[in-house]
């Protein structure tokens, strides 16, 4: 008998707790609750056919065995992925720290000041290195950033260009191939043509509205693009540049020679390669383009007492507000990796990063000179870290490959027979000597081992950086490990994460990220693998990916899986591109409309637009369900043009709609597909699934249902699962022989995250996963039962129960007292809780999802808190508290306010800070008072250098 299965540690509710909760809900058994919650016609008849669960110890041995199948050769392939050194102080205190990896996107400003500052450091570093005034706080990867640049520049076309139908982007042929593939996927549905050619032969024409360049280019050559950029601007063409962020420590930054957008990846700033991801893409642009910029932007603001603070700025651009009119569908990005990159810049500072870049460049210069002595011809006139060689007549690429592999080295091999390599931060003298030996042996030459490499540069004066960067004091003050550790800790104390308390965000599934699932990520065999190594060197990764894919097929009831999308939004986009490709293959490419319920998350319409579709909104009825009459009418009205329905199940209202099978049948009868948004899959696993219900494709959020962490806004993984007829259209990659529908730079997206979900499924097993779903539903219904008589529950299913989340009614409170759902959210911070989801999907409400991981004690404490806040609301209603000066409208109360000598409120300090006894045991002090949300938008200050003075 196995006694240490993960399920007993992951699920917070035991049998005794269950009995107590069921009595409160008013049902006799857990099965009765589930039977009354989920429609009988969609219940699975058999348990999921998954492997028996492993104990945590057994999984540790299993994952070690898989890791041992990965062969960690020294890899110099480059092409956007490079070995790097993650400072141990960052790995230990950020990457492996649950305070950082279990936090949510920093929408709740007052309990997010730590990671907001960390992300502001990232933005500042990006702006400094690129010499651009504005950067966002990460995108999914470099290739996605390129695609975002294309669509942003398309939106920024002049009126003349729009009238003329300008739709061509010139792309220099020396761009990374994976970047070109992802841009192509994005460009096609937008009607944008990518015209690939030599930048030196570029001739402006009216149909060209933008140009994209790589710096240094894909072969490693550093081109002087200043004249090209001037020529493009004279023709009203914008210029976007994919720039190696580390090279900009030595090279003239694109902002100094006129680039309009600079993008790329910050993987080289201390983030392991992880077999392709995750790492933080970056995106920088001009200030005048800020409202067209994709992704989240951190800016300065002040709290109500004038204290400087940070917040997420210009949110009205984003999909959760603008929906189909959003600048992008980007939602989850790469916050944790951006945080790490920002800390890397803080830890090393300007001189440290210059030293790292100079060392890389010096080794490259040395190898260039030495290999020329062996008879090789180096083709890059100017370079940073990458050399490309034409071989002597008597030497072949295959000879070099054989010798290199015998020394466990991977080089880059070009189609024309050239051989190259990219030097990185980990290249030391021993590695340099191995590289020398490979090329010397192939050429039949003698060579001498070297003891050191002289500091040299081959960069022309015109291309050499002369301007300082990272000049803010934050990049100078924390260069010892002691100071760095304390700085990181000082920031993490400002934030609420799962390490503090339950985060009950509806539609976000903030469940446990178990340590046993997280540990494999720190293994070098998973951290240090380049995504383009030969397949036989990545057998462990490939086996894990294959096993996980099979598990996800079983769980979803589908025939095919792609793990490539780097987020849920990317999954939506990928799934819609698959639908488009399928429809075109059967002569139905004219279908261009997506039907979306009004309750849908904003990413749905934003993704549909990005995938080249038009959206049609379907109404919801008074019970929160899809209005069947309106659905039938809209489906019939758009029958010939309808491509798909996008629907979340259970709905974003937290309800298992009884007509879901009929909904799928109506759509299929129109010749369209059903796209199921898997955001709420945590209420399906083991009990029903999208394939059985009748959907054709769904995406999953591994960072919700499948236990990978949110990381303060990423990394996420959004794999798509599809029915048999859609399998041929899944995203490709050059290593698969086809780049159709490619949506991320790496073949398996953020492969480094996959061991977490793999571990979750392998350790939970069928019974554990199914029980987790049941308990998630139990917990939501328990909270609903506890709070229904005070706040009230907005929507319930046909039999009176909610799904795995519920919407708390706050609109009547506002009508009667002026207290808003936002005031309640801010007051929760004084009790040590992160707010539930505000005003989504119903304005003036709070959506709560407790997940299966919380204990009854935590649920009861949350109920006590909510009921005490209800009492505080009643005090305002009954005029026992001042309507204009009470604990709710003044919340949250930072420590500096509580200890201030000038306490002028009509209530006591104790009522403000310690409203119930449990708060005394685990007090979380907010760092700032309520933040001014308009100030930071009126004057956007996106770097540490900003000032309101």
From Swiss-Prot:
Q: Which positions does the record annotate as the modified residue N6-(pyridoxal phosphate)lysine?
A: 704
Task: From the UniProt record, list the reaction(s) this protein catalyses.
Answer: N(6)-[(R)-lipoyl]-L-lysyl-[glycine-cleavage complex H protein] + glycine + H(+) = N(6)-[(R)-S(8)-aminomethyldihydrolipoyl]-L-lysyl-[glycine-cleavage complex H protein] + CO2
From what superkingdom does this record's organism come? Bacteria
Q: Which InterPro entries match?
A: GcvP, GDC-P_C, GDC-P_N, GDC_P, PyrdxlP-dep_Trfase, PyrdxlP-dep_Trfase_major, PyrdxlP-dep_Trfase_small
Q: What class of enzyme is it?
A: oxidoreductase
Any one GO molecular function term: glycine dehydrogenase (decarboxylating) activity
Which GO BP annotation is one of this protein's? glycine decarboxylation via glycine cleavage system
Please give the Gene3D superfamilies that the UniProt record associates with this protein: Aspartate Aminotransferase, domain 1 (3.90.1150.10), Type I PLP-dependent aspartate aminotransferase-like (Major domain) (3.40.640.10)
Entry EC number(s): 1.4.4.2
**What Gene Ontology cellular-component terms does the record carry?**
cytosol; glycine cleavage complex
Query: Which coenzyme or cofactor does it need?
Result: pyridoxal 5'-phosphate
Record's keyword terms, sorted: Oxidoreductase, Pyridoxal phosphate
Q: Supply the Pfam families for this chain.
A: GcvP2_C (PF21478), GDC-P (PF02347)
Q: Does the keyword Oxidoreductase apply?
A: yes
| NCBIfam families registered for this protein in UniProt | gcvP, PRK04366.1
Function noted in UniProt: The glycine cleavage system catalyzes the degradation of glycine. The P protein binds the alpha-amino group of glycine through its pyridoxal phosphate cofactor; CO(2) is released and the remaining methylamine moiety is then transferred to the lipoamide cofactor of the H protein.
Assembly and oligomerization? The glycine cleavage system is composed of four proteins: P, T, L and H.
Family in the record: Belongs to the GcvP family.
- For this entry, the protein name equals Glycine dehydrogenase (decarboxylating)
Q: Which organism is it from?
A: Bacteroides thetaiotaomicron (strain ATCC 29148 / DSM 2079 / JCM 5827 / CCUG 10774 / NCTC 10582 / VPI-5482 / E50)
* Gene from which this protein is expressed: gcvP
